Regions:
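Sec-dependent signal peptide recognition
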Residues: 4-11, 131
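A mature extracytoplasmic/lumenal domain signature
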Residues: 57, 67, 111-115, 127, ...
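Bacterial N-terminal signal peptides
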Residues: 8-21
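N-terminal, post-signal-peptide region of Sec/Tat-exported proteins
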Residues: 46-86
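Extracytoplasmic
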Residues: 48, 58, 95, 104-106, ...
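Short, low-complexity N-terminal intrinsically disordered segments enriched in polar/charged residues
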Residues: 2, 20-55, 59, 154
């Protein structure tokens, strides 16, 4: 299953990793390949590009956002449509020190994050991404986060 195409993806992921800030680079080429769709999601969010976000999502994927101790559930497609609406507020999500684990065609990314609006931290917490290897690429199957307002000042 992880033949020539997988090796190409790993090399491509490694090559793309040189464009990533050091704080979100993973240790191995395989881990870097897992982070490619995560970073593409963040890029699509910043550009408010719902189609770019959907390209790295498994159809039917889900999201759970913990807000004020309560889970808010939505589909990944619904999230992309919501974030992809035009707006004047700039948004950016940053992760750091990602913990990446891979078992064959499943992967998980656990990382602290900050979400910025107009360059200021709006909320922070931990992101959890579940990814699947399908059709020769990693896709985000689900996302959960612990968004909270009590973020450390940086």
């Amino acid at each position: 299953m992880f033949g020539r195409l997988h090796r190409i993806m790993l090399v491509a992921g490694f090559g793309c990793s040189t464009l990533l800030p050091l704080s979100i680079q993973a240790a191995t080429p395989a881990e870097q390949a897992v982070l490619v769709p995560v970073n593409a999601l963040f890029d699509g969010m910043a550009k408010r590009d719902s189609e770019a976000m959907k390209k790295v999502m498994l159809p039917g994927g889900t999201m759970v956002l913990m807000r004020d101790g309560k889970p808010v559930q939505l589909t990944l497609e619904g999230f992309a449509d919501r974030v992809g609406k035009p707006g004047t507020t700039s948004i950016e999500e940053r992760i750091h020190d990602p913990l990446v684990r891979i078992d064959h065609d499943l992967a998980v990314v656990w990382a602290p994050f900050e979400f910025l609006t107009d360059g200021k931290v709006d909320h922070c917490g931990t992101d959890l991404f579940n990814l699947v290897w399908t059709d020769g690429k990693w896709l985000i199957a689900s996302v959960a986060d612990t968004g909270r307002k009590d973020c450390p000042v940086k």
